[in-house]
Amino acid sequence: MPQYFPPTPGGNATTLNITAATILKAAPGRIYTVSVVTAGTAVGAIYDSIALTGNTTANQLGTIPQAVGTYPFAGMPTASGIVIVPPTGGAVAVSFA
C-alpha cells in the first residue's frame, strides 16, 4: 500500500549541506526553514524556478542572510519549483514540502 505523507508545519523533506545552486524540487512546493550552518561572504537567494540559471528578482522569493542562524519562511508557496542559491562560500540546510 503506498504511503502518503501530507505536508506538515515544518515541511516533510530536508536537504542538508547545500553549498552550490541546487534545484530542491522541480514542482510546486513550500519553503519552511533555511538554516545557515556555515557563514558566507554574500547573501544567497530562494527562487520559484526549475532552472539553475536565468533567475532574477522577478521569481525570487527571498534572500538567505550570510550569517549563521535559522530563518523561517512560514510555508511560502512556489508555483514552479524550488531553487536554493546559498550564501557565497556558505552552507545551508532547508526544510520544504
Give the residues covered by each predicted segment.
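Surface-exposed, low-hydrophobicity beta-strand/loop segments enriched in small/polar/acidic residues
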Residues: 1-97
